[in-house]
Amino acid sequence: MGQETEISKRYQVAKERYQAIGVDTEKALKTLKDIKISMHCWQGDDVKGFLNPDGELTGGIMATGNYPGAAHTPKQLRQDLEKAYSLIPGKHKLNLHAIYVDTDEKVDLNEIEPKHFTPWVEWAKEQGLGLDFNPTFFSHPMFKDNYTLASPDKEVRDFWIEHGKRSRKISEYFGKELGQTSINNFWVPDGIKDCPIDRYTPRKRLMEALDEVFAEKLDEKYTQEAVESKLFGLGAEAYTVGSHEFYMGYGITRDKLICLDAGHFHPTEVISNKLSSLALFSKGVMLHVSRPVRWDSDHVVIMDDELIEIGRELVRNDLLGITNIGLDFFDATINRIAAWVVGTRNTQKSLLKALLEPTADLKKMELENDFTSRMAITEELKDFPFGDVWNYFCEINGVPVGLDWLKEVKAYEEDVLLKR
């Protein structure tokens, strides 16, 4: 009780300090509580899935490390996810890939149906979570010569077109059952290792294949689709068919959400700078918040400059209503539950930091060319008691404050993970 009282006291002091510059902390906390983060399932087992868990991870991505305790079954993964969600304030979503089927049937990617994900839906209902989805265009024998939907081989294309169509029905099923729109994100890793002669034709094939996948109109109350670009991957260093320009054009002309992954661009390029432009021309955005270290390494999200900028762009430009925030990282060198907790809580913190700015006043100063005040206030804000507001948010949402969550993760590791 003593700690709770101390947290509340510190919050009251922080509240008054923010109030003095025109910031309503209660409003900020209410807004933050309503923001759902789509936490990705694949951190829990290093992107192996349950369709062919012993198969090779392909698609130009890589999970490094061998930390003990990875989930090997859907039940174990759900148990780990429950632990992670219990340490994160608010109610959120889970982002599933197609390879995370939960069925005793022997089923291939072009055969999956909603029934193969029913245990996930029942669990999500119990936990009060929404579900997002992703067709899996990698780690499969039909990922041939680095191609799926853009393959010159019609048999290969047709296999993946069918997979894409079936993924849409699964996402629709999630939306209907859970009462929350399910975002179905299409990332296709097709590409070439060395300089291609023909960049145009594979892109035409990809466009036509996607058009076939999306031919049936589905109710967007239940499912919305996003398309995700990438600059390069391992084995596709010279050319990726689904580039940023390709998917920006495709998304805008086909009325799809555009997915921006923080690691899918040139190392000096940031997605925070793209959000305001896409907001003007696209129907909306799906974010994959990640941390690239010199390449698309999918490191756990930390409170770095880009994460802070993403939060600012979403809040300052009032883009939260058209943005779906998801995470995408997988680090097998650390405790996987800790990875989820650190990444998700940091994403929430970046949003709270932005919500605690006097945005309207700062915009007015900028409009009036009062750059002196703009700089002075934004710099002074760096020393404001943001941490006390965050700790209070954790307390009122019934999750551990400060590093207390780490004790729970360590205990869970000892009791559960190390016994697997």
UniProtKB/Swiss-Prot annotation:
Enumerate the catalysed reactions. Answer: L-rhamnopyranose = L-rhamnulose
Task: Look up the domain of life of the source.
Answer: Bacteria
Q: List this protein's GO terms for biological process.
A: L-lyxose metabolic process; rhamnose catabolic process
On cofactor binding, the record's note says: Binds 1 Mn(2+) ion per subunit.
The record's section on Gene3D superfamilies has: Divalent-metal-dependent TIM barrel enzymes (3.20.20.150)
List the gene name: rhaA
Q: What is its main location?
A: cytoplasm
User: What protein am I looking at?
Assistant: L-rhamnose isomerase
Sorted alphabetically, the keyword list is: Cytoplasm, Isomerase, Manganese, Metal-binding, Rhamnose metabolism
Enumerate the subcellular locations listed in this protein's record, separating them with semicolons. Cytoplasm
Broad class of enzyme this protein falls into: isomerase
Report whether Metal-binding shows up as a keyword of the record.
yes
The taxonomic lineage of its organism, from the top, reads: Bacteria, Bacillati, Bacillota, Bacilli, Bacillales
Q: Name one GO cellular component term.
A: cytoplasm
Pfam families from the entry?
RhaA
Under which pathway is this protein filed?
Carbohydrate degradation; L-rhamnose degradation; glycerone phosphate from L-rhamnose: step 1/3
* Binding annotation for Mn(2+): 264, 296, 298
Role according to the record = Catalyzes the interconversion of L-rhamnose and L-rhamnulose.
| UniProt-listed Enzyme Commission number(s) | 5.3.1.14
Species assigned in the record: Listeria monocytogenes serotype 4a (strain HCC23)
Q: Which family does it belong to?
A: Belongs to the rhamnose isomerase family.
Q: Name one GO molecular function term.
A: L-rhamnose isomerase activity
* Record-linked InterPro entries: L-rhamnose_isomerase, Rhamnose_isomerase, Xyl_isomerase-like_sf
